[in-house]
């Protein structure tokens, strides 16, 4: 039957339709003639050239507006918009100016500033590259815009660029065409029109369209069965329609706009580092000012050349303090450790696109997971067959294993017995032949790649896979071997017959039939369709016990329909009935009247199977305190059934609408959720497990609500429809088989589409964060030691103990390698048995900060002590008194004059200080193998990377001492006696930390554990966004 609307030029009466300057917004709820009248278009002739010009002026071109990318110079400047970076920049500039003012050469004065600038440029480069990659998400949407389209203009069909389409155009679409713009269906020229709109709605099945009005003012995309959406694909049928939305005023355009307005989300670690940076900058400023002020009375020291020169001298010390206090290597170490973590995750098919998302995974409290292709395989499979066993109305059920499009699986008979030759069973043999012949899909193995290629609807592909699992009866001896992997059974049946006629699937008949002529010249009709409709056309049933075709009785009919209902209610299976009949050889055409007197073959139960790993993955999430919410475009019953199969819902769980009030609110449709209003929505998320029939905006709203309640939200998805929610979530997770848009909008891509991979990624995220805390603490304590050394030297009036360039070398190179290696500390065994950490958990709490302050003070004191020891106590050193050392500026006026001043130019004391600083920090790195466990329990070789990093750092340190680089850093080689003192001063740091670890273990009567996820909804105020229906703040009591 052809579905159409009456043609002719509509009157230009006032249609009363809604007009928002963007075209007709309610075309789905309007008659075709009303839509045509709105756009003043003749359904038989289309728009005229003049109409097209006017429409283009009014609506613009059918293109998404290009986003203005951020200029490169702005991206570069953005990387320097950080408080610590600004302090370092200021220190570099001031250091250069002072060096030049004191008569140093430009080359000499540039060394320290250039080192600082190179560090900052390296970090900025990484930031710019990362942000440039993020902009690709918007551009990827263009791949879903059709290139060309067939339109009716001036009474003639024309092929034009899709960008030239305007609202009001009549477009013609056929199988394989991509819909160029949002279109109201006006004519369907085939018995059915099916659209694959999974990229927009997430529906796993192609959707059948029609021309009738949809009487539903709140219809979501899935309900608008008379609308074709831009970017979706025609998989069956031919039709015409009126374009009602172009460019950004399409469903996909609105998704793109939602992506475009997303703001950068600060991850928990980034927020903590920002807070730490702000605090550190204040501390640095205070210390620098304090050092400068404390030494004001020394500005007039004659040895410094006057008050102004004295002020400059102590200002240089303040600059050195700033350099010492800032952990310059921290950004690089954090980036390196996260990058190394991503490499490990990539080996397990979790491909991370943005480094901060690694850390965010560790504190995820909610995963909003798409069903199709994420929790399920997105590969329909026949898993049940029901047939009439005998004329006594007894039914026999068969199970079919295998849950993918790969033709591997077994057939189990009643009682679970494996059938070695399934096709020798009459009903299965006929079912396989019907599945192969009454089928328009194609499945084949590509010769070049060896991969399975498929064309057509997933239901029909599942039938081909089913036929392959059944195989051929043993009575048939094919001319050549049948290869299951090459779909040999399907090929045999197709080559054995000639298709003579086809009755396509239609909405009113709900079945499809083909007429074929076999090699034996026998003509047969093979039919498939909805069981209740096929049964009406049947007069006989194929008995499975060898009786052949027996009359279909009322008892048989009732038994078949009862089995169908059981399939649907128990496992939410989609049921399909198969039938056939032989016709005279003179029959060469098919008519609807031929679909009668059929012989019923059997029922097939099929579904989109859950991934086998999902149940255990969801169990792990539960143990780890992570809530999983299924969010899908499929219907409510199917979604709930899958939720039960993967363990998200228990089989006994009562759902919305039941009498059990304690279990209400577990499952909602998108419309039910939307109609609740802000108060109801926020309350519903507490127990929500399944949200079905959703649109993109529902996903966004869900993410907003969860984030407002303090949750750290991960959203998984694979379609264009998921992209805005992926961007809005704290971490977006796309499937590897998903669309390019989803992948570029996501923070992480699952290469194997395996939900279990998410669990591994979450665990790895927790490990990485714990290790990140360890090396951050290590670097903080090291920097505290450097600050203490500079501050103490300034207070005591000592010569320059460490120069800024030496401090930079220690911070970046010798400290950086062990800090990075700490990222490889082993995970705690109960990592996934604890709840997620709270976002506001500090990296360093009060007690830990006190511990590292003590360590830092020890580091600073022994660094200065080594310096003093060389001048006063070392026989081969300065051999001077304390007074001479602290009044080094007056050496020229002392006995010996210039000769005595030469000792203050020796490189040995500063080299000893630098070496003590390096070695003590290597020992301190060992302290950070664990927060509280002793080195006696966790030996250094437990982290071989750390041992290697310490060895490398020491080798680099020896390198600058005993090579030509010593001049650049102002150091020199040390004697055995000097190295002995360095070790004596450095090693006790382990004893100091062991004492504090023991005290820490004593004060913790129970092992430290996570405080779990977010606070209860009953305890918080929930701020609402502008998208909420209620504008007031919400407080649940």
From Swiss-Prot:
UniProt cross-references to SMART domains, sorted A to Z: Cation_ATPase_N
Active-site residues per Swiss-Prot or TrEMBL entry: 370 (4-aspartylphosphate intermediate)
SUPFAM superfamilies linked to this entry: Calcium ATPase, transduction domain A, Calcium ATPase, transmembrane domain M, HAD-like, Metal cation-transporting ATPase, ATP-binding domain N
Pfam families according to UniProt: Cation_ATPase, Cation_ATPase_C, Cation_ATPase_N, E1-E2_ATPase, Hydrolase
PROSITE patterns membership: ATPASE_E1_E2
Record keywords: ATP-binding, Magnesium, Membrane, Nucleotide-binding, Phosphoprotein, Translocase, Transmembrane, Transmembrane helix
UniProt keyword Zinc-finger, yes or no: no
Catalyzed chemical reaction(s): ATP + H2O = ADP + phosphate + H(+)
Name of this protein: Cation-transporting ATPase CA1
Organism taxonomic ancestry: Eukaryota, Viridiplantae, Chlorophyta, core chlorophytes, Chlorophyceae
């Amino acid at each position: 039957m052809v579905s159409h609307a009456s043609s002719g030029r509509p009157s230009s009466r006032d249609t009363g339709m809604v007009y928002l300057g963007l075209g007709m917004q309610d075309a789905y709820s309007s008659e075709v003639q009303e839509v045509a009248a709105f756009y003043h278009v003749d359904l038989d002739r289309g728009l005229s050239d003049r109409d097209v010009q006017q429409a283009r002026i009014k609506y613009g071109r059918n293109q998404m507006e290009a986003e203005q990318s951020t200029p490169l110079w702005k991206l570069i400047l953005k990387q320097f918009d950080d408080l610590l970076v600004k302090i370092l920049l200021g220190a570099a500039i001031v250091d250069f100016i002072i060096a030049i003012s004191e008569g140093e050469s430009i080359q000499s004065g540039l060394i320290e500033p250039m080192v600082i600038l190179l560090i900052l440029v390296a970090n900025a480069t990484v930031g710019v590259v990362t942000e440039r990659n993020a902009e690709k998400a918007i551009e990827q949407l263009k791949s879903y815009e059709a290139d060309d389209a067939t339109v009716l203009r001036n009474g003639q069909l024309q092929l034009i660029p899709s960008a030239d389409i305007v609202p009001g155009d009549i477009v013609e679409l056929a199988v394989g065409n991509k819909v160029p713009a949002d279109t109201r269906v006006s004519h369907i020229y085939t018995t059915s029109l099916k659209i694959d709109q999974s990229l927009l709605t997430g529906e796993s099945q192609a959707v059948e369209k029609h021309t009738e009005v949809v009487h539903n003012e709140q219809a979501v995309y899935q309900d608008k069965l008379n609308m074709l959406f831009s970017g979706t694909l025609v998989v069956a049928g031919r039709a015409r329609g009126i374009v009602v939305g172009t460019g950004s005023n399409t469903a996909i355009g609105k998704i793109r706009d939602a992506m475009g307005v997303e703001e950068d989300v600060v991850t928990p670690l980034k927020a903590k580092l920002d807070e730490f940076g702000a605090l550190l900058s204040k501390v640095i400023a205070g210390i620098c000012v304090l050092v400068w002020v404390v030494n004001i009375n020394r500005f007039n020291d004659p040895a410094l050349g006057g008050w102004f020169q004295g002020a400059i001298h102590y200002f240089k010390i303040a600059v050195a303090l700033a350099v010492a206090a800032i952990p310059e290597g921290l950004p690089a170490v954090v980036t390196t450790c996260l990058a190394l973590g991503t490499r490990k995750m990539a080996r397990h098919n979790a491909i991370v696109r943005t480094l901060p998302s690694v850390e965010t995974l560790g504190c995820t409290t909610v995963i909003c997971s798409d069903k199709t292709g994420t929790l399920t395989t997105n590969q329909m499979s026949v898993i049940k067959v029901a047939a009439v066993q005998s004329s006594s109305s007894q039914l026999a059920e068969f199970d079919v294993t295998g849950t993918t499009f790969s033709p591997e699986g077994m057939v189990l008979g009643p009682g679970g017995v494996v059938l070695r030759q399934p096709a020798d069973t009459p009903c299965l043999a006929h079912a396989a032949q019907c599945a192969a012949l009454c089928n328009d899909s194609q499945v084949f193995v590509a010769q070049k790649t060896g991969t399975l290629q498929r064309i057509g609807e997933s239901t029909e592909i599942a039938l081909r896979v089913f036929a392959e699992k059944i195989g051929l009866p043993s009575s048939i001896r094919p001319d050549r071997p049948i290869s299951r992997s090459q779909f040999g059974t399907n090929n045999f049946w197709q080559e054995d017959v000639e298709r003579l006629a086809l009755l396509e699937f239609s909405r009113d008949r709900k079945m499809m039939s083909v007429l074929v002529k076999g090699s034996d010249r026998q003509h047969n009709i093979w039919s498939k369709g909805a069981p209740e409709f096929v049964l009406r056309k049947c007069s006989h049933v194929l008995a499975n016990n060898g009786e052949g075709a027996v009359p279909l009785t009322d008892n048989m009919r009732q038994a078949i329909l009862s089995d169908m209902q059981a399939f649907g209610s128990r496992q939410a299976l989609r049921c399909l009935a198969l039938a056939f009949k032989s016709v005279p050889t003179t029959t060469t055409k098919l008519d609807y009247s031929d679909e009668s007197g059929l012989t019923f073959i059997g029922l097939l139960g099929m579904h989109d199977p859950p991934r086998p790993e999902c149940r255990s993955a969801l169990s792990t999430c539960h143990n780890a305190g992570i809530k999983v919410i299924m969010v899908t475009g499929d219907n409510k019953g199917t979604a709930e059934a899958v939720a039960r199969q993967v363990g998200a819902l228990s089989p006994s769980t009562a759902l919305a609408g039941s009498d059990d009030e304690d279990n209400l609110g577990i499952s909602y449709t998108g419309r039910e959720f939307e109609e609740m209003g802000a108060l109801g929505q926020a309350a519903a998320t507490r127990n929500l497990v399944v949200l079905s029939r959703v649109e993109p905006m529902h996903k966004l709203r869900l993410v907003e609500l969860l984030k407002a309640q303090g949750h750290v939200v991960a959203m998984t998805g694979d379609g264009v429809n998921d992209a805005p929610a992926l961007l809005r979530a704290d971490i977006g997770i796309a499937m590897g088989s998903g669309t390019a848009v989803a992948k570029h909008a996501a923070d992480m891509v699952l290469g194997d589409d395996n939900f279990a991979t998410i669990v591994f990624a979450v665990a790895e995220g927790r490990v990485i964060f714990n290790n990140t805390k360890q090396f951050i603490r290590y670097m903080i304590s090291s920097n505290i030691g450097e600050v203490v050394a500079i501050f103490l030297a300034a207070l005591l009036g000592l010569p320059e103990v460490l120069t800024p360039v030496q401090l930079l070398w220690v911070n970046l190179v010798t400290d950086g390698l062990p800090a990075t290696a700490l990222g490889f500390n082993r995970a705690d065994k109960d990592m996934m048995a604890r709840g997620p950490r709270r976002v506001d958990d500090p990296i360093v709490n009060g007690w830990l900060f006190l511990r590292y302050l003590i360590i830092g003070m020890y580091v600073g004191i022994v660094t200065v002590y080594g310096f003093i020891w060389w001048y006063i106590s070392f026989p081969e050193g300065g051999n001077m008194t304390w007074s001479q050392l602290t009044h080094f500026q007056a050496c020229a006026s002392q006995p010996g004059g210039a000769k005595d001043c030469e000792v203050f130019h020796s490189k040995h004391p500063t080299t000893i200080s630098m070496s003590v600083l390096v070695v003590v920090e290597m020992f301190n790195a060992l302290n950070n193998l664990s927060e509280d466990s002793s080195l006696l329990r966790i030996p250094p070789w437990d982290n071989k990377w750390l041992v290697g990093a310490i060895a490398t750092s020491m080798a680099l340190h020896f390198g600058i001492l005993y090579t030509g680089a010593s001049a650049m850093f102002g150091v020199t080689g040390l004697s055995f006696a000097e190295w002995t003192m360095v070790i004596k001063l450095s090693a006790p740091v382990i004893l100091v930390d062991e004492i504090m670890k023991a005290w820490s273990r004593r004060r913790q009567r129970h092992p430290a554990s996570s405080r779990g996820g977010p606070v209860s909804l009953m305890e918080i105020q929930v701020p609402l966004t502008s998208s909420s229906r209620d504008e007031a703040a919400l407080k649940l009591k």
